[in-house]
Regions:
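Conserved thiamine diphosphate
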Residues: 85-99
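Glycine-rich phosphate/ribose-binding loops and adjacent secondary-structure elements
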Residues: 1-89
């Protein structure tokens, strides 16, 4: 495990898929790719390399209006996306954020087709 920490997601997916197949347990688990998924091409690449699903955390946040101020962990997100603070969360319009996220996913879906 230690030898594979920090490798690019493409190499990690292929390596995990291959190892699970060698062990005969690939059918017993799912590979979910996370990190570095920035566009629909990255989704296609991950699936082609053996991932069963992808996680698109940062792309989804940016679609919702995140400016990458990197304060998520503080709970003081300037745009109200990653916060529990009632005053800051007023800055996020959930309907607009949802529409933007739907547009991102719909666009990626059309590109993948």
């Amino acid at each position: 495990m230690r030898d594979h920490v920090g490798i690019p997601i493409e190499m990690a997916i292929a390596s995990v898929d291959q190892r699970l197949r060698e062990e005969g347990i690939r059918h017993k688990c799912s590979i979910i790719a996370s990190g570095g998924i920035r566009c629909s091409a990255d989704v296609v690449k991950a699936i082609a390399l053996g991932a069963d699903a992808v996680y698109i955390g940062t792309a989804a946040l940016i679609a919702m209006g995140c400016t990458m101020c990197q304060k998520c962990y503080t709970g003081k997100c300037a745009w109200g996306i990653c916060t529990q603070d009632p005053e800051l969360s007023k800055r996020l319009n959930p309907k607009v954020a949802a529409k933007r996220l739907v547009n991102l996913l719909r666009g990626w879906s059309l590109e993948i087709k």
